[in-house]
UniProtKB/Swiss-Prot annotation:
GO terms for cellular component: large ribosomal subunit. Belongs to the bacterial ribosomal protein bL32 family. Residues 1-59 are annotated as: Disordered. HAMAP family: Ribosomal_bL32 (MF_00340). GO terms for molecular function: structural constituent of ribosome. It comes from Cupriavidus metallidurans (strain ATCC 43123 / DSM 2839 / NBRC 102507 / CH34). The keyword Ribonucleoprotein applies. Keywords: Ribonucleoprotein, Ribosomal protein. This is Large ribosomal subunit protein bL32. The keyword Ribosomal protein applies. Pfam families: Ribosomal_L32p.
Amino acid sequence: MAVQQNKKSPSKRGMHRSHDHLSVAPLAVEPTTGETHLRHHVSPNGYYRGRKVIKTKND
């Protein structure tokens, strides 16, 4: 097993972890309904890029 030779300081530990944070997923607004949804995903009403692609219960 690998064992560290010297203790890593809190500063170095933080620098090592600096890129591990989570980012907020980008949201898109559907132009026809005005609803927000994840990019490249169908909106809750079944619209994708201005077109109705899925029939929903309300249809």
